[in-house]
Amino acid sequence: MRLSSEAKIAESGGQPPTAGSRSETGSESTEAESADPKAQKWYQRSLNPLRWQKIPPVPEERTVSREYGASFFSIASFQWMAPLMKVGYLRPLELQDIWTVNPDREVDVLTKRFEVSLEKRTNAGAKRPLLWALYDTFRFEFLLGGFCHLISSLLIVFAPYLTRYQIAFATEAYVAQRSGQPAPRIGRGMGFVVGITVMQAIQSLCTNQFLYRGQMVGGQIRAVLILQIFNKAMKLSGRAKAGGVQSPEQQEKIKELKAAKDQALKKPGSPPADDKGWGNGRIVALMSIDVDRINLACGMFHISWTAPVSIIVALILLLVNLTYSALAGFGLLVIGMPFLTYAVRFLFKRRRNINKLTDQRVSLTQEILQGVRFVKFFGWESSFLDRLKEIRHHEIRSIQTLLAVRNGILCVSMAIPVFASMLSFITYALSNHVLDPAPIFSSLALFNSLRMPLNLLPLVLGQITDAWTALNRIQEFIVAEEQKEDIERDEHMPEAVRMDRASFTWERKAADKEAEKVEKKANPRRTEPKSEAPTDSAESDEPFQLRDMTLDIRRDELVAVIGTVGSGKSSLLAALAGDMRLTDGSVRLSTSRAFCPQYTWIQNTSLRDNILFGKDYDEKWYDQVIDACALKPDLEILPNGDATEIGERGITISGGQKQRLNIARAIYFNAELVLLDDPLSAVDAHVGRHIMDKAICGLLKGRCRILATHQLHVLSRCDRIVVMDDGRIHAVGTFDELSRDNDLFKQLMSTASQDSKEDEEEATEVVEEEAEKQAQQEPTKPAAALMQQEEKATDSVGWTVWKAYIRASGSYFNALAILFLLAFANVVNVWTNLWLSYWTSNHYPSLSTGQYIGIYAGLGAGSALTMFIFSTYMSTAGTNASRQMLQLAMTRVLRAPMSFFDTTPLGRITNRFSKDIGVMDNELCDAMRMYAITITMIVSIMILIIVFYHYFAIALVPLFLLFLTASNYYRSSAREMKRHESILRSAVYARFSEAITGTASIRAYGVQNQFRSSLRDSVDTMNGAYFLTFSNQRWLSVRLDAVAVLLVFVTGVLVVTSRFDVSPSISGLVLSYILAIAQMLQFTVRQLAEVENNMNATERVHYYGTQLEEEAPAHIPSNPVPESWPPHGEITFDNVAMRYRPGLPLVLKNLSMNISGGERIGIVGRTGAGKSSIMSALFRLTELSSGRITIDGVDISTIGLHDLRSRLAIIPQDPTLFRGSIRSNLDPFNEHSDLELWDALRKAHLIDSDTKDSAVDASNPNGNANAQRLTLDTAVDEEGLTFSLGQRQLMALARALVRNARIIICDEATSSVDFATDQRIQETMAQGFEGKTLLCIAHRLKTIIHYDRICVMDQGSIAEIDTPLNLWEKEDGIFRAMCERSGISREDIVGQVEKE
């Protein structure tokens, strides 16, 4: 498979790529080959009518679709597509070639119409406001498609009836010639031929318009719903997101919705739907999977009602042909309908269950990918893969059951016309009627005309079932509770903030008890010890609350908010930002607000755009903000200054840079109220002092600033201080007042006083990893885009992918078995109708009527049975292939190096594991099966006609060449359009997913419209390509239908001219078959396009499963490590050199040191010294360039990555929590007892060591019994956002304690906790990790001066390494200078050592 690179469109909303946007994958040569006629296959060159034309240049910009303003003839024949098809045949299509959507189809225009209708329908009390609003919006195009299909369906039925008269004409001529009577005039026969041909032509045009209008409506509905889901996600309340009890209004709406679905709520006040809440994963699934199902169903929706109409008309005509005998066949159809109804209900139920499993898989996949760095640190790849595999196993089994039922319905629906015709003909024969070829084969053609609607009806009903379920889910989401703006605005009040007895609550999942039941059922022996668990389970289920808050803050005041971990500092700011629900009292703000949260949300765009955040660029103000936030030095380092793309989630910049960017965003927003949640925790003291001076007390002077902080040394500069305790305001006052009168404040200050000087003077110039991350970028690149451009194949899906797909299905034997079953089923089917012709002409006089009937019935039954076996075998093999390829792709992705995740948007990966896998599961098998059945039927018909009408072969040759030319002409463009659409769709997913994760920040700043506009532009860009993917199908279909019409005409002429020589029975059989050709050719083209387009999804999954770069093996069988390794934890670095990528400078240079088992090493150093690189090297996130690292004598490069990482533990700076419970986060794979988990929570100070109750804030000196309780089953929401950053860091410490590894790496694990908790954590690390090897990368020198040795890094090398006291004695040493700047004296070091 040759690959080229799609230009990055996620940033520009789909702007054309630059000339230098191709990746180094040989795409230039590939595309040159595609465009070069000499590089094409000989038959492609021979059939190329444009081979002498010049290759057109790539346009500079995209233009509006040629459909806009096209003539009636051009629209009817899709001639407006011809210019693009021509370009696509001459060279691969580029993004600039893809036309934009018609102005009246832009999503903004459609959304406005939709929203007006939705409001109107909702106000009118419609039961299905969403459904009716969609109908109102797209009524004209929707009904036009339905009208076209009604005409088409009627013509499909009337054309076979007209063959009765042509067959009668042939019979008359045949009998007349045999009896010597005058033959009928040939003009009469030719008149029938012309009539049938005209009817076929009109039917073709109508069918293509129906399909085009249906797909167009589906694409437009998809666009509107994506925007609606996004808009709702921006407004969704925390309670609805978490799955909690909704407001009475929302409950009433949900009750109405459930009643319409014949489902009642379990009890009043119960959570919505399946009690899961609308987490990010479910919202993404709505946008990617459910919306796509609605889009798919729109394409052929009208078949659901036109099929019954055509069936009824056909039965009336059958009564005319066969009299009452047709009622026998009709009765069989009637009997079959209840079976179909029951089966559809079963499909509806199964699809709902499958949706839940798919949601689980997609949500877990997204969560794993978001925390992949942490998963790698702990070596959990295999365990998470097993968890995904288990969910996938149940999902595939459910899908296979669903498809088996669909196959049964399909085969029954295919068999019904056969058995109905069989029953009618047998009844007709047994009722003493002569089997005249004219009514018999006209009736056979009528029964055959029923085959397509009956075949498609169950598929369409299945799609409608899926869409109905999806529509209900979206409807349920749209009526979910919205975040109310509880905070009032009063521009005239003197204060900036006025809180009067206000109470707030976080809203989390109400169904935690249900989850707890499931977990306990899975682990019946895992129970909490009675002596440890809290007695009040209701309290443990309570979310954290702020109570009785009364506070007024002036417009120009700087107010600090302090308190212990979990006291409610961050919650107070979140409440003012609108993230918490007001439950009592009132809050009023006088002005606009900006929010700098503790956890920075970074967009996948440039640094400047992240700071501007939708505001207009003001160069002077921007420069002032950059300077005040100490970002100028960083801009000089970045390869393209502030235009540098900083990657998804800000992966290319350090924690300190993220925090400063966060502060800069809040300041640049120029609001009068600025909420700052611990903004100085991730920056060093030097930078923190600069920000305090220049930003908080500089640019923001004169504005209302509320600063939550652990840096208590800044309190003296604040106008007032708010002391939080247990979710309440404990005290408010000036620094002097609180120092004099408040005991809790005094206690906090006394704890902090030991560290305050260090915090003021500590002088690492910026956070340690900043320069190291910059070193990962090519310094000489002038404007490199960080995100890798998505691979895009420029050739058809190659045999490599097909072979991989067949192999993944089980074995290559499957392909042979499927082909054999298909051929056998078609042979039996053709023989069934051929036998009917022998019966009508009494070809075998020796056979009785009963024998004819018996053989005829046996062939019909055999045809249905073999078709069912074929269909079931194929769908089972296909879903097995999907399961295996997903497993390979997911395994490969989790085994990919971190550089892959750093340069690939999460939405792009999620797209492959949601949309593409959904296509492989549900659409690919159907498309391949229907294509295979239809193409073999066409071949069978051609062979049959040639056997009896030899001259047909002469006409077939030029028509076949025309068919082949048109197909080749089409496929070149179709491939490129689909691939462009796939990549543009990935960009929409990425943009949608990114914005959903940043909802809190987007809301706080009030920039929802900006992100909506960005998504809108991406959707329009995607639709520009998507609409063309089916427009070119229709262009081809019209032209191939012209071939089919000519085939009908030629066959009709041959029947007329051979009327004296060929039996009327054979003529009737041939005519009945040839009329099905037009439908079949249309269907073949459509299914071939579906197969190719759906195989594109397989190709993308296959690429992830085979082409991604891999890390070293997880296990090396030839070099296993014993269970007890490492027994001592001795680490040796021997001349270690490391660079992040080839061609980049070394970040570790000839580093050598020996760390004894049980030794505690503190690692410090200036910017870019290489401290974090040591961690990367030890975990082998980046492989060494030279040298080696040994642990207890074992070279870590010679053992498996899992064997290494599973024996290490890390406490990272950015802790990651997964959705579930505290138990599942501490011990996700049930490897430890509950007692061990409780002990870890106690040691990490997440629960009180002295009482039975478990409190979040054990460091709270007053230990209030009303504090939020934790149990092992306490729910952890998505990304753990219901816990403060400090609490998450404590959870990471508890996780490391549970792991009980011999070697622990600590990466500034206490940066977001207060000093009292920090002190207790240091004690825990000293006691809990006693005898363990501990490497600690530290910001606060005070925390490591009691370690055994200090390693001072400088420019990738060890500058100093010795005991703290010995390093202090070196007067010109780096460590000595750092200590002096931090206010650490010799006595401090000696004192700490003596304490030890």
UniProtKB/Swiss-Prot annotation:
Biotechnology usage: Cichorine and its derivatives are promising in the course of developing novel herbicides.
Region (Disordered): 1-40, 510-543, 751-787
Family matches, as Pfam families: ABC_membrane (PF00664), ABC_tran (PF00005)
Effect of loss of the gene: Abolishes the production of cichorine.
SMART domains with a match to the protein in the record: AAA
Location of the ABC transmembrane type-1 domain: 143-466, 816-1093
This protein's name: ABC-type transporter cicA
Native source organism of the sequence: Emericella nidulans (strain FGSC A4 / ATCC 38163 / CBS 112.46 / NRRL 194 / M139) (Aspergillus nidulans)
Lineage: Eukaryota, Fungi, Dikarya, Ascomycota, Pezizomycotina
Gene: cicA
